[in-house]
């Protein structure tokens, strides 16, 4: 906001362009929503909702990005996040349609979130999971195919419940 000359502190309330502030904040690839408004008491309120990455993609083709909880691509930053890293044969379509729901399912389960360090996608789109504990790799197979986004998420959740229940018994 300062760089664009619209920082509201020290500016008369009538000269503050709240719409422009909202538009500027919304342009950030890390902002999901931005709201800005003035009150009758002469205050300016700015509310920003951050996009939440669920998985980091480091594909063999050189792509490096995050996918958020709305299945949208986000650029990487200089900061690291404690997220699962997906490597291998990954294109953006597969990352947003299959790996993002898989990441959301894993991150929603406290044990899986702490157990799984990496997901590797093989050339036939089979999935391997690399746990934080031990020096082994777990092959879980291909994720279920579904055309509908909601059905796909439910199918991936059911698939992971079955696969990870077996693996969870091994670690308990």
Regions found by a protein language model. Give the residues of each.
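Charged, solvent-exposed interaction patches on well-folded alpha/beta domains
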Residues: 3-27, 32-172
């Amino acid at each position: 906001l300062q760089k664009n000359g619209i920082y509201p502190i020290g500016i008369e309330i009538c000269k503050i362009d709240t719409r422009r502030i909202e538009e500027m904040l919304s342009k950030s690839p890390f902002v999901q929503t931005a709201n800005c408004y003035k009150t009758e008491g002469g205050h300016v309120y700015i509310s920003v909702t951050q996009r939440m990455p669920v998985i980091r993609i480091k594909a063999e083709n050189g792509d490096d990005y995050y996918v958020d909880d709305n299945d949208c691509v986000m650029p990487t930053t200089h900061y690291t996040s404690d997220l699962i890293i997906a490597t291998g044969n990954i294109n953006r379509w597969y990352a947003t349609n299959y790996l993002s729901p898989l990441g959301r399912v894993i991150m929603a389960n406290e044990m899986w979130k702490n157990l799984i360090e990496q997901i590797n996608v093989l050339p036939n789109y089979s999935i391997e999971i690399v746990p934080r504990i031990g020096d082994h790799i777990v092959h879980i197979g291909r994720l279920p195919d579904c055309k509908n986004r909601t059905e796909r998420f439910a199918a991936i959740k059911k698939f992971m419940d079955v696969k990870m229940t077996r693996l969870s018994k091994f670690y308990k």
